[in-house]
Amino acid sequence: MKRITALALSLIMILCAACVLAEDAGKNEIGTLKVGEAFSIQSRMPEGYTYMPVTETELNMVGILSAGAGKPAVTVSIAYNEEYADTERFNDVDEAVVEEIRDSFREADEEVTFEDLETAYGTRLLKVSGDGFVDIYTIYKGYELEFVMTGDSFTDADVQMMVDFISDMDFVTVE
């Protein structure tokens, strides 16, 4: 009886490990950032997109999600900000700070509009829309993340694609 129980538990553990590995299958490493501890950033690419790194340092990275015809281009920017060193998620900053962030977008373009969104896991996102761009902004573990779509027009499906991409993103600690 003990052997059957041990065998059953072993089988369950193997199946659980396989499920975890299957969940990460298909995710591409986008880059590695390091402030204190290092993070490998991984995500599944949206359909039709590939990631091309432009610059990467220990504190920040910039890349482009390249797409086929008819899809908006996306610039990915992830940068460490000392001001948010103790901030786990954008949800954790108070509304005065959110308003300062909005003001910084208004400085570049007074006509921008804002909409609050959230990832599948409840992380707050700030959608900033202007002429020819949609910027999706958030904060995670002290990093400011921006995903800027550029093009002539954007559909709700384009915006949802970016929200899904951000929702799927993993910051995996590198040892």
Predicted regions located by residue number:
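Positively charged n-region of N-terminal signal peptides that target proteins for export
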Residues: M1-A8
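Bacterial N-terminal signal peptides
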Residues: A8-C16
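Sec-dependent signal peptide cleavage junction
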Residues: L15-E29
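Short, hydrophobic/aromatic-rich segments at coil-to-beta transitions
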Residues: K27-T32, T57-G63, E118-K127
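Secretory pathway targeting signatures of secreted, lumenal, and periplasmic proteins
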Residues: A38-F90
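Short, solvent-exposed coil/turn segments at beta-strand boundaries
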Residues: R44-G48, A69-K71, A120-G122, T138-E146
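Signature of long, low-cysteine stretches enriched in small and polar/charged residues
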Residues: E99-K141
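Short, well-structured beta-strand
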Residues: T123-E175
